[in-house]
Amino acid sequence: MAHKKAGGSTRNGRDSEAKRLGVKRFGGEAVLAGSIIVRQRGTKFHAGTNVGCGKDHTLFALKDGKVKFEVKGPSNRKFISIEAE
């Protein structure tokens, strides 16, 4: 008589939903006020001129213009600014 013992249960088999983080508007791209530029965890990018920072560190445009990425300061921080048109 052939018998197959039941397989044990596993504690795996879950995964969290992707959070869609990253740069949404790139350098030189035209944006309108309120447009999201970067979604991030922490301040990988810092807010420069005409850019606001949300409570989840999302960077967004405060004025219409073009996106500009720059590296500033002794610690080489990455800043994102909007050059108003």
Curated annotation (Swiss-Prot):
Entry-linked Pfam families: Ribosomal_L27
Keywords: Ribonucleoprotein, Ribosomal protein
Annotated spans, Disordered: 1-20
GO biological process, one term: translation
Top-level taxonomic group: Bacteria
Annotated GO CC locations: cytosolic large ribosomal subunit
GO terms for MF: structural constituent of ribosome
Gene3D superfamilies: 2.40.50.100
Database matches in InterPro entries: Ribosomal_bL27 (IPR001684), Ribosomal_bL27_CS (IPR018261)
UniProt cross-references to NCBIfam families, sorted A to Z: L27 (TIGR00062)
PANTHER family: LARGE RIBOSOMAL SUBUNIT PROTEIN BL27M (PTHR15893:SF0), RIBOSOMAL PROTEIN L27 (PTHR15893)
Protein family per UniProt: Belongs to the bacterial ribosomal protein bL27 family.
Protein's name in the database: Large ribosomal subunit protein bL27
Organism from which the protein derives: Serratia proteamaculans (strain 568)
